[in-house]
Amino acid sequence: MRESGILMPVSSLPGPYGIGCFGKAAFQFVDFLSAAGQTIWQLLPLSPTGYGDSPYQSCSAFAGNPYFVDLETLEKEGLLTAADLKAESWGTDPLEVDYGTLYVSRFAVLRKAYAAWRSQCAGLHGCAYYYPDDYYAFTLANEDWLEDYALYMALKVANKMKNWVEWDAPYRRRDKAALAAFAAANEEEIGFWKFVQYKFSVQWQAVKTYANEKGVQILGDIPIYVSADSVDAWVGGKLFELDADGRFARVAGCPPDYFSADGQLWGNPLYDWAYHKKTGYAWWVRRVRHALGIYDLLRIDHFRGFDTYWAIPATSATARTGKWENGPGMDLFDALEAALGKLPIIAEDLGELFPSVRKLLADSTFPGMKVLQFAFSGGDNEYLPHNHVKNGVVYPGTHDNTTLTDWWENSASEKEKATAAAYLHLTPCKPTAKEVAAVKTAAARTALLRAALGSVADRVIIPMYDWLGLGAEAHLNTPGKLGGNWAWRAKAGFDTKALAAQIEAECAVYCRCNADAQNVK
């Protein structure tokens, strides 16, 4: 089945309270997708943002982002007032997330909502510790991660948000008596973090259910690694490579290459794959099972790391001292499929890959990715549309690429533009510089979008900002850039009927239109 979808982060949805969330705009966007004949809504990870505001550096591999809880829904439930919302600052630019402001304002109102919820529960049942049945059901179903997460966040607050490796030894080393005493003294704070996750879950499941009813599947994204400053690292112990003192022995990154003489030092703890194998990959089974309760499809970031990964001594200042190690390969995916059935996974297989990585992708039968912005460097490039395969997913660009408009105007080299212009029939086959310069940005963008849609690949995912024709202001993430990422938000009213009709028409030409779209009024 040929289908198409749109990449649109929840954070990028419009709304009055600083960041996109699970409110009206999310449901309206589902309506837009359905009207546009789209069957996939691709998201960035829904986990809490961490270092650099990145959803790929989260404090938890299981928790949801508190920022996405819809405040207007809490107001309707009587947990917040209009005055509560008006009292906070939500930033000055509705087209950009101000994470510094958001950190203060969002948690301030969520704490008010929690206090009101506790009072509401006490008033209904005459008992301060009697909560709704669905709350108890949620905490029971998620206790394998929720208890540790709530305790970890309460400890983070008590330690002024310091990295857990800087906590006092009893807490850092998870001394049972110390943790029990802390939990008893901080029951309300721990309860707050559980409450936020409960509301996140209830609200997100409402959005997901609505999307599925409209024929739209949710494509989620899970990073291969966890953050060093995370509850997963704090409680993981033997899951990771540790030295004699219980600290991380080696960390993740990339080797030196043409773009970086020192390589990339990511700093994520590395898995002890031998230990994971002994457990039957139990942690990974839990992680993927949890993700499949949130999403319908999963994109796994840095798929190559399951074959071979770059391991760097934790004390190293650069990635130069690392070396290649073997990952679990098909052994992991066989274990996952044995436990969970056929896996709806899309593998992020971008970059230069060893033959063994390509073999792993083939053995797994997971679809890989092709990115058009990488296609026009010259020669018989594997990303050129005529080299695509049916079992694949095509993107004009990913969240790490700039927009098509900005790529054409500012990022693409003259060689890339000339190659693309000729390939896309925008110029003669051997264009002059003048002929390439005469190509309008809008024409180039449309041609690139149509090249993606016309690919033999089963699926095409187009970022929302490329349908809108936006420039550098919508560039979500520049790898290696510290700060200023993940901030783009769409203008209110972006999802018009006219644009939906245009997208539906473009996709229908290439037999990618959801047949049910014509029945959506």
Spans of features found by a protein language model:
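N-terminal regions that are enriched for targeting/export leaders
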Residues: M1-S11, F27
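Short alpha-helical segments and helix-capping/turn motifs at coil-helix boundaries
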Residues: K24-D31, V202-Y210, W284-R286, G379, ...
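Surface-exposed amphipathic alpha-helices with a cationic face
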Residues: S34, W204-N212, E337, L361-A362
